[in-house]
């Protein structure tokens, strides 16, 4: 799922990371919940895809359009500027190429700047754990594309393992 959190407002969008695309023109027909309802129910000329697979980008152009859609949706709601700052969760252990693909897609979609945070650290912060303390905390995050296991301490990840098997 794609979650958009706005400071002071909380989570303002929580929708499936699914996009319905016309196969020949590559025109995006639906994004999010509407596109998910189309999974397995489309004619041959329309395909409902997940542009993020196993926690990484599988279709850069469609991912960019999906991010752009959510930026516009949040901007129209009056929650943020048209060129927001983005913090994006990524699986631990992704390659530099995969990180760059995420960052580039967000910039092309209109982000002013992008910071990438490993998902176990984001989960620890979201759970209210004292990640800056010299105490170890184990995080197990079973997401849609990956399962992440990590130990955090002193504001960082001490060790982590990401398995590209999860709840999807």
PLM regions: where:
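Conserved Rossmann-like nucleotide-cofactor binding loop
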Residues: 145
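Nucleotide/phosphate-binding catalytic cleft detector across ATP-hydrolyzing
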Residues: 3-142, 150-168
